[in-house]
Amino acid sequence: MALILGIDPGSRRTGYGVVDVVGNRSRAVAFGTITTSHKEIPPRLGEIFAGIDQVVKEYGPAEVSIEKVFMARNADSALKLGQARGAAIAAVMQACVPVFEYSARQVKQAVVGKGGAEKNQVGEMVKYLLKLDQRPQEDAADALAIALCHAHMRLSLARMAGATSVRRGRVR
């Protein structure tokens, strides 16, 4: 059993998703969105830090995966996204949990099978793969997809490295 926390950073809404992974099986443990309430960026960053810190303390993930910053058309938006991402990573690193980064294209490829997939396709696949009753809110679905991407990469890397216990449902 390994808990993986996926984070979809955003300056207004940061999605999180905790996935329990045993071998090639995954199940959603918790997911949601940290919605910031302030107009100014410094208090929003504090809310993101506190929210992710609370999730890390509550679930104790073994590993964390987070989406890489993409180059936005608007430099100010990219800067705010980078700051939100930094606040989330700082909260995780405070607990000494390893962080892995994936591009949006890598996440879509791992979950949907094509890197150019639409948001609704990602949400539907997350619902299907984790056997959820309904599609999660967009930011939470993205966070769960990021966690699933890491679970797939982790399993693939273990197989390539010749991990012996992958065959028994555990990666060691």
UniProtKB/Swiss-Prot annotation:
Domain of life from the UniProt record: Bacteria
Keyword Acetylation: no
Binding site for Mg(2+) 2: E67
One annotated Gene Ontology cellular component of this protein: Holliday junction resolvase complex
GO molecular function: crossover junction DNA endonuclease activity; DNA binding; magnesium ion binding
Cofactors required: Mg(2+)
Pfam families with a match to the protein in the record: RuvC (PF02075)
Active site, renumbered: D8, E67, D139
Primary location: cytoplasm
Keywords: Cytoplasm, DNA damage, DNA recombination, DNA repair, DNA-binding, Endonuclease, Hydrolase, Magnesium, Metal-binding, Nuclease
Record note on quaternary structure: Homodimer which binds Holliday junction (HJ) DNA. The HJ becomes 2-fold symmetrical on binding to RuvC with unstacked arms; it has a different conformation from HJ DNA in complex with RuvA. In the full resolvosome a probable DNA-RuvA(4)-RuvB(12)-RuvC(2) complex forms which resolves the HJ.
Family under the similarity heading: Belongs to the RuvC family.
The protein's role, per its UniProt record: The RuvA-RuvB-RuvC complex processes Holliday junction (HJ) DNA during genetic recombination and DNA repair. Endonuclease that resolves HJ intermediates. Cleaves cruciform DNA by making single-stranded nicks across the HJ at symmetrical positions within the homologous arms, yielding a 5'-phosphate and a 3'-hydroxyl group; requires a central core of homology in the junction. The consensus cleavage sequence is 5'-(A/T)TT(C/G)-3'. Cleavage occurs on the 3'-side of the TT dinucleotide at the point of strand exchange.
UniProt protein name: Crossover junction endodeoxyribonuclease RuvC
Organism from which the protein derives: Alcanivorax borkumensis (strain ATCC 700651 / DSM 11573 / NCIMB 13689 / SK2)
